Amino acid sequence: MKRTRWTALLGAGAMVLGAGVAQAQVETLMPPLVAGAAKARVEALKVHSKDIEGNLLGTPAERDVFVVLPPSYERERKRRYPVVYALHGYSIGADQWMKEIRLPQTAEGAFAKGTPEMILVLPSSKNVYNGAFYSNSVTTGDFENFIAGELIDYIDAHYRTLARPASRGLVGHSMGGYGASRIGIRRAERYGALYLMAPCCQSPVGSRGLTAEQVTQLEALTSTEAASTLPFLLRGTLALASAWSPNPLRPPLYLDLPVDSSGKDRPEILAKWAANAPLAFLDQYVSKVRKYRAIALDVGDKDGLVEDTRRMHEALRAQGIASSLEVYPGDHTSHLAFRMQDYVLPFFGSSLSFSK
């Protein structure tokens, strides 16, 4: 069956339209164990966010966060560590993201191969629409502010971190890649290095053929919980609309769709969506983004996001911002764990500051 542009943009990674996203994503290949790798420790936290309090979807302000502490953390009590924040994709939470990238095994393997030890932090942004797109919205809550503000402050207060931008990294895959590009561009002063893994939604996504019948189906929903029965692509439409075109005057969904009930595009809503595309707002933050110590992008050659990823790389270079791009053999999810162990963590190991 044909893979649609929507599926690629939302970062499903599904090879068949309608296939379960989580099912597709756990097919990530497993790297072999690295001989002699010391054990890391994983802590599961609940971090309260004032930025997410009071959102109209009722998404809990207590957010699941996983922290991977390096092998030496308990032993070297005076040592401080850089921190890398890793953002998950659409339809999954941080727990499934951990499984996809095979943490803590891939971190242990990277450290055993010579990557300097660091702390990894994986927050969850999953909600009733399967993802908040790491944006600020009265409907979803202010996830951008939470990730770039409250979460950093919490981790720096509770762990032995090197609490400065030069020792802080941001990475994400798919929707998380969108989040990393969005936050990494808009809040560049908070981070020292940025890595985008097959980032979705770098270009304006448009209405993508949303029909009058589909709009009628969505507008007939009587609760946000009813969205759980929707097909994948329609649920993804609600996720985007709740993040990018929230409307507190339109219960129960509290959003505006980019197409009206007659099937016509709504230019004022599409303009809001386009304004949230990193390729649309990059130019406004060039002076901040230029200060990164390093920026890298990667994507599989069989991934529908190849061209969008390439466009972001080219846009950075056009502004005189150094970045690297690797298009590797693979699809949207096939090599995530290998990439994390052998490329992503070594990238941060060589680009972040490890000195006090």
What are these model-derived regions, one by one?
Residues 10-18:
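Bacterial N-terminal signal peptides
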Residues 23-356:
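Non-catalytic cap/lid and distal C-terminal segments of serine-dependent acyl enzymes
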